[in-house]
Structures are given as C-alpha cells and as structure tokens.
C-alpha cells in the first residue's frame, strides 16, 4: 500500500552559493561515492547476486539539462555500507559525452539540482551547516570557492529573461503576545497539553507520555505530531515576487484563500495559479471538508463530481485575479505555451476518472482535451520552445516519453520507450535536448540523453558497470492473459539464475502494494534476490493497479480480495502448468496491499508451500483506528467502519484465520504508522495458537518504507530473511545457509 502523504506548505528557502569547482582529469571519479571500509571483497563474476551487492547499486535521479543543452546535472545516490546510511551528491556530465564529474562535497548530502534560466548557477538542496536554508548554488563562471549565504537569487517560477521569480508562501506568523510564563514549556512536545485539552498534567515535570486530541497525531515517516498549542488559525499561501539581485521580496496578494502552483508567463507579464473555485477562504473550505468528513457515506453526495479548484491569472505586478475557465474537477501542473497565449494543465474530472491534458486560452474559454479517450494517463507536461508538448506516461508496466497532438485529434506519439521505465524528462531552453533516467529489468538506473524528438539517444553514465559485469541479472518474460470478465492482465515471469532446461524450479509470486501502484519493466532488488536463489519469480498487475487507465485502477473499490485475487491466481495457474515449474514448491509474498493480499490468500488456499507477508493488514476496523490514512478505506470501502461494518468485516483476513495452514513469515516495522504493528501481532498469535509454523521479525527505527528507504543494514537483513524463508520451505535449504 503505497500512500503519499499530503504536501506540506512550501517553506521559504535562503540561497547558498558555492563557486564551480575546476576538476582535473585526475579528479574525475569512476566510483561515484566512497563506500568506506568494507567487509571481505565479493567474488568476481559472472555470478548470482549476493546480499552485499545491494550496497553497490548506484541510483541516478533528478536529471536537469542546462539551458544551453551542454550539460546534465543529476543526483547520484549510493549506500555507504560501513556507516549504515545512504549518501547523495550532485554530478554533472556533458551531453556530448565524457566522464561525469562530482560537483558537490563528498562530506555533505546534496540532491535535486536545477539550473538558473541564464545558466550561471546550478542550485541544489543540501542540509549543510552554516546557512539559513537548504538551497545552495554552484557558480559556473568562477573557479574554487566555499559555500556562502546568498539571498539575492530567489527560488520560484521565472520568465524567460530570468529577471525575477514568483512563488507562494504564507505570510509571517504574528509574534506571540505572551500571557505570562508557560508552565508546560519544559515538557516534551507530545507531552504538552494541546490547546483546548480538558486535562492537564498533575506535575509537568513528572509526565513524559503523549497527550492527543487531534486525529492527525501520527504520520508515517514523521512519527508522532504534537497537537496545536494555540487556537487554530489559517495562513493562506500568498503570491510573492522577488527580483534577481535583490534580497527584498514583494507580497502581491493578501487574501483569505491560498494560491498554489504559481507559474509566470514567458514574457513575465502574467501569473497563473490554482485556487478554490469560488475563492473561498481556507478556513471556510476546511470547515466544509471537516463537516462532510463526519457524515455517513452517501452515494449521491460522495460520488458526485466536484469543482475542487480552478485556474486563475493575475498581472505579475499584482491586481485582481481573473478565472480562466470553470472546469469541473482538479487542475495541476500548469504550464504556459511558448507564446504566452495559452495554458495547459493536467486535469482530472473526478477521482475515479483518468487524468487528461487540457489547453485553454489565457483570456478564457472552454478547455480542450488533447488526449481524448486514450487509455493511459500523463504525468508532468513540458511545452517546449519549439511548440511541441511532451510528457511521460506509464504504459502498463513500462513508461515512455510522448508528444501530444495539439489539435487533440490523434493519439500521442511515442518518442522514447521500449522495455524499460523512464523518469524525470528534462529539456534545454531551446527545447531541442532531452535527458532522462531509465532502468530495465536487467539494468539499474542510468542517465540518457537524446534529441527532444527521441532521436539520437545515447547513454551518458555507467555508474553500475562494474556491478553489471559481476552479477548476472535475471530477465523476465512478459505475458498477458484474460481473467474474470475477459479483462486482460499483464504479467512477467523471471527466470532463476543458472536456469537449466529440463529441470523443475520453485516459484514465488510477488504482489505489489498500493493497491494503485504497479510492477513493470525496471530493475528490482527483491525480484533479483529470489531469482539469484534459484527460483522463478512471478509478478503481475491485477485489476486495481495503476498504468492502465482509471477504470482499471478503481475497478476494485469495495471488492478487494475478489476479482483481484482471481487475477493473481489465474497467473499462478498459468505458470504452475509449465513443465519447468514445481507446482508443489510455490510461495507468495507482498507488502502493504500485497501484505493484505498474502494473508487473504492464506485463508483461501493451501496450494502455497510458504508465504511471507510485509506491512500486513488483517483487520480493517483495527487498521482504520490505528493507521494514518483513514481516507483510503473511506473511499475504497464506501464509508467508515460503522457506515459499512459488514464490508470491513468481510474483507478482513482475521475473520477466516482458522483456515490458514501455510507457514508464514511476518515482517513489520516498529514505527510503521501506515500499516501498524497490531495487524501482524494478532495474525502471529492466531497462527501460533493453531500450530501453524510462523515467525515474526520486527525492525526498529523503521517505518512503512523500510523496503525502499530504510536503514541499509536492516533493508538488506530483510532481503536475507525472505531468501532464507523460501529457501527453507521451497528448496530444503538448512536454516541460516541461504543468507548471503
């Protein structure tokens, strides 16, 4: 279950400056990040993946093409095994080719590069000390230099000439007037009594617990959140303007409503932004939302399309805003046409409808749908100086860069695609050079560049070359099949390392989280981990997955564990019938939604010899009360538990736990506030009481994202446990001998 937390308000960032380094050939580093002291060296290849290989994988992200198209900056990240951490740096490579160079200090964390419009500065995010904020810059026209604070280069949307920036942020909070000494000032934040709390500590010095009055008192990845210390107040995000070279910023608006996603026109005369459709104050919008949230589910009211927001334009010097169009739904990712006469945006008419690209005249009118009934959904838009409009989209389990037909009469044209996953398309100012990162089933991420039309593609980095030379990554065969309702489902079967024709192999099926996420044509450590152990790895995108259009994605509402279960088991049937698969030695694994589904499967069938469940959900009513994401089931299960208790109970695996016979390994994080520990605990105790083989591994200092961003040592330990569990039950490997 991969949920995204709501965006936090934008924070004002001071700007730091460090002069561009002069890097000699001797300073060009072939290995991107020093790994520090290591354990015994790994054997040379070609060979199967070992757990220690995980520490060698380099991740490349956030590509940014310089305005002149001559360079690409990127974030390069690798684990530092000796220190149990990840480390990120900014690297730069010429688009003409050559060795990439490190541009930031190896002693500090740096990420998310972006160029100034004039190409004189490369900005990046870094938590280095000695400054007033997290945004720093590298100056390209002077050698050497150290990080210094500079507040004269603003952060935000800029016109073509780069003379100023427009951004949104709340007004400064009024300083507290003070009402005498605060008797709770020395208490821990969570122990302090929130505003309007009825109870108070008998002795503030002797209470170190948690005092909760707000529903949002814990957030996955953040932890426990203290309650408000004062009456609720609103600080709407206003429009601001700051000239380059000037530290002063000018406030353009003073309204009760927030301005979002502000973008300035190419000529600098106009600002487009998203705001409430009726420009109601934030306090009014929140009061309405809070009131509706308390009501029982009502199909007519809750399933009706709503006009959540609209696009407005205002002069860049300030003034009254003008609505561009009344459009039902939500708008995001606004971008101006190169001539500044039109606006494009990604619009979604309702939560269960596919996102489309729309274009509207900046003076008003009816938005035009450029994608028609095209099955797939766009992500961010780039309207290039050449007039071409391009975007990235998931096409089932792969992704591609596409060009939209501005007339809206033809389907988008695929420019760059293939059996891989692409992310982060970036362009130069002229709209002629494109960079992106890509990964395939047998290759971790690297940086690529091409002409903006997709021609002349070439790979610019080889950070993972030595790893790829040592390890034989397993590839997967893509297949499709018809399931319930004649719906076509996409799946993949990864061959085991050292595959020999005529031999039978065990098989493990992976079930993804979300449920509105997907597997696909990218390198994945978990698949390679089990394939290296000599197992087939099966993975599919059952109904409910993303990448196939909104109808497919939301077809499982109120029916989790029903047709989606059939989709999964149909794939198992197909693979189990292969002569090289041992159908008596099959396993299943998954996390979050996949954790729910694996426990559900355990109650439905005994055909699997072993199951491993991660971040599981076994009782939906318990989950609703203990998770930080109640909105998920309020939407997916049509209301709160007391609105639809029968459905919550029917879809809870714990109601059928007496049917479970399959040995199970439970993996859970102590600080997971998305799928809390109680679901795993009740499942563990139930299986123990019934004599079913079960183990539970609880990881400290870890949250819902352990398998993605957790501490490296714990993440690798988890991979080893999964390998050992299936090695024991599917291959007869003795305990502890499959941990490398």
Q: What are the roles of these predicted feature ranges?
A:
Residues 69-72, 119-122, 165, 271, ...:
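Hydrophobic beta-strand positions that form the internal "hydrophobic ladder"
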Residues 281, 500-505, 510-548:
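Short substrate-entry loop that stabilizes the transition state in hydrolases
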Residues 64, 166, 214-221, 225-227, ...:
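Non-catalytic accessory segments flanking enzyme active sites
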Residues 29-34, 87-88, 170-245, 277-312, ...:
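Predominantly five- to eight-bladed beta-propeller fold
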Residues 78-82, 128-131, 172-175, 278-281, ...:
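Short glycine/acidic-enriched loop and turn motifs that connect beta-strands
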Residues 526, 532, 539-740:
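Active-site-proximal cap/loop segments of hydrolase catalytic domains
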């Amino acid at each position: 279950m991969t949920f995204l937390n709501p965006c936090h308000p934008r924070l004002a960032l001071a700007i730091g400056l460090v002069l561009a380094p002069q890097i000699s050939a001797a300073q060009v580093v072939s290995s991107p990040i020093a790994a520090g002291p290591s354990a015994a060296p790994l054997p040379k290849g070609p060979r199967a993946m070992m757990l220690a290989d995980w520490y060698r994988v380099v991740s490349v992200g956030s590509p940014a093409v310089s305005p002149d198209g001559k360079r690409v900056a990127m974030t390069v990240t690798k684990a530092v095994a000796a220190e149990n951490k990840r480390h990120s740096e900014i690297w730069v490579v010429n688009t003409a080719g050559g060795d990439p160079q490190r541009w930031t200090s190896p002693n500090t964390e740096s990420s998310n590069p972006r160029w100034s419009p004039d190409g004189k500065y490369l900005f990046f995010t870094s938590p280095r000390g000695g400054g007033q904020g997290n945004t720093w810059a590298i100056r390209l026209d002077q050698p050497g230099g150290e990080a210094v604070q500079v507040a004269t280069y603003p952060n935000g949307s800029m016109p073509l000439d780069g003379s100023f920036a427009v951004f949104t942020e709340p007004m400064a909070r009024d300083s507290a007037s003070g009402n005498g000494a605060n008797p709770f000032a020395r208490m821990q934040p969570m122990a302090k009594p929130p505003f309007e709390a009825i109870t108070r500590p008998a002795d503030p010095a002797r209470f170190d617990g948690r005092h909760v009055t707000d529903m949002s008192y814990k957030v996955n990845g953040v932890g426990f959140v203290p309650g408000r210390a004062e009456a609720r107040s609103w600080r709407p995000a206003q429009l601001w303007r700051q000239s380059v070279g000037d530290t002063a910023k000018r406030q353009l608006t003073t309204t009760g409503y927030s301005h979002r996603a502000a973008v300035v026109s190419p000529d600098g005369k106009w600002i487009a932004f998203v705001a409430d459709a009726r420009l109601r104050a934030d306090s009014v919008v929140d009061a309405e939302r809070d009131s509706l949230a308390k009501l029982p589910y009502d199909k007519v009211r809750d399933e009706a399309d709503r006009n959540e927001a609209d696009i407005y334009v205002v002069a860049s010097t300030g003034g009254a805003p003008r609505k561009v169009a009344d459009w039902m739904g939500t708008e995001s990712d606004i971008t101006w046409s190169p001539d500044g006469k039109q606006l494009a945006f990604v619009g979604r008419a309702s939560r269960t409808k596919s996102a489309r690209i729309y274009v509207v005249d900046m003076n008003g009118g009816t938005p035009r749908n450029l994608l028609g009934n095209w099955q797939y959904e766009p992500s961010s838009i780039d309207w290039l100086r050449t007039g071409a409009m391009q975007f990235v989209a998931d096409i089932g389990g792969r992704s591609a860069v596409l060009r939209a037909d501005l007339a809206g009469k033809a389907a988008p044209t695929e420019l760059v695609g293939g059996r891989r996953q692409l992310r982060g398309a970036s362009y130069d100012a002229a709209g002629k050079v494109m960079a992106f990162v890509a990964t395939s089933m047998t290759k971790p991420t690297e940086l690529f560049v091409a002409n903006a039309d997709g021609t002349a593609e070439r790979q610019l980095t080889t950070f993972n070359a030595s790893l790829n030379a040592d390890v034989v990554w397993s590839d997967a065969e893509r297949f499709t099949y018809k399931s319930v309702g004649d719906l076509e489902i996409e799946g993949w079967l990864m061959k085991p390392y050292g595959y020999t024709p005529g031999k039978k192999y065990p098989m493990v099926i992976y079930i993804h989280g979300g449920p509105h996420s997907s597997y696909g044509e990218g390198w994945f450590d978990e698949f390679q981990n089990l394939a290296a152990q000599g197992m087939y790895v099966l993975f599919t995108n059952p109904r409910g997955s993303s990448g196939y259009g909104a109808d497919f994605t939301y077809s499982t509402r109120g029916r989790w564990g029903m047709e989606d279960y059939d989709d999964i088991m149909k794939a198992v049937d197909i693979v189990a019938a292969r002569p090289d698969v041992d159908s008596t030695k099959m396993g299943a694994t998954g996390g979050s939604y996949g954790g729910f589904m694996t426990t559900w499967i355990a109650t439905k069938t005994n055909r699997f010899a072993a199951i491993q469940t991660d971040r599981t959900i076994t009782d939906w009513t318990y989950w609703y009360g203990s998770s930080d994401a109640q909105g998920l089931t309020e939407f997916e299960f049509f209301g709160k538990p007391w609105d639809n208790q029968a459905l919550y109970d029917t879809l809870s695996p714990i109601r059928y736990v007496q049917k479970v016979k399959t040995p199970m390994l439970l993996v859970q994080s102590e600080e997971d506030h998305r799928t809390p520990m109680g679901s795993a605990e009740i499942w563990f105790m139930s299986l123990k009481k019934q004599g079913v083989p079960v183990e539970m591994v609880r990881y400290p200092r870890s949250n819902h994202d352990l398998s993605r961003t957790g501490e490296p040592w714990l993440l690798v330990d988890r991979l080893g446990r999964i390998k050992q569990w299936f090695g024991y039950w599917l291959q007869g490997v003795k305990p502890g001998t499959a941990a490398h």
